[in-house]
A protein has these predicted regions:
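Donor-nucleotide binding loops and adjacent catalytic segments primarily
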Residues: 1-34, 44, 64
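Hydrophobic acceptor-binding patch used for acceptor engagement in glycosyltransferases
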Residues: 34-35, 53
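Short acidic active-site motifs
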Residues: 23-25, 86, 110
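Catalytic binding pocket for nucleotide-activated donors in carbohydrate/polymer assembly enzymes
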Residues: 43-99
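Short beta-strand/turn micro-motifs composed of small residues
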Residues: 1-2, 37, 56-58
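C-terminal amphipathic helix plus adjacent low-complexity
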Residues: 89-133
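Aromatic "clamp/platform" in nucleotide-sugar-dependent glycosyltransferases that forms part
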Residues: 40
Length: 133
């Protein structure tokens, strides 16, 4: 998140830190076999949308809630450590929740419908000032 650091910081042969880049992140996730995370809401939803199995290692209460919901939705498994072997075992039997993808794709239509319904209610409840003059 620091603009003045290198794009990639290599710690060793197995660990690298990358500057935050939404497009590169999503491209990387789209090409990965599985995803390990601390269970941040957005990245778990992105993994679910892309059909990627997830290992979630929550660090605080919001992440605990996200991980619990995602596990119940079939997105992945919860652990207290980044046990990548467990993730790979889970990935071998994982089936993406296509209902989630369909639901996400329908959101724009659903939101527009709800807004239009709200507008219809507001218009029906409006009155003309002339009626009171």
């Amino acid at each position: 998140d620091k603009a003045d650091t290198e794009e990639v910081t290599k710690v060793d042969e197995t660990l690298r830190f990358y500057q935050i880049d939404d497009i590169k992140f999503l491209n990387g996730m789209a090409g990965c076999r599985a995803y390990a995370s601390t269970a941040g809401f957005e990245s778990i939803c992105e993994a679910m949308y892309l059909g990627k199995p997830v290992l979630m290692v929550p660090a605080h209460i919001e992440q605990d809630c996200n991980a619990y919901d995602a596990m119940r939705a079939g997105a992945g498994i919860i652990s207290d450590s980044f046990d990548l072997e467990s993730l790979l075992r889970f990935a071998g039997r994982y089936t993406p929740n296509r209902n989630f993808t369909s639901w996400v794709r329908s959101c724009e239509r659903r939101i527009i419908f709800e807004l239009e319904e709200t507008m219809n209610v507001v218009i029906d409840e409006m009155y003309m000032v002339e009626s009171f003059v």
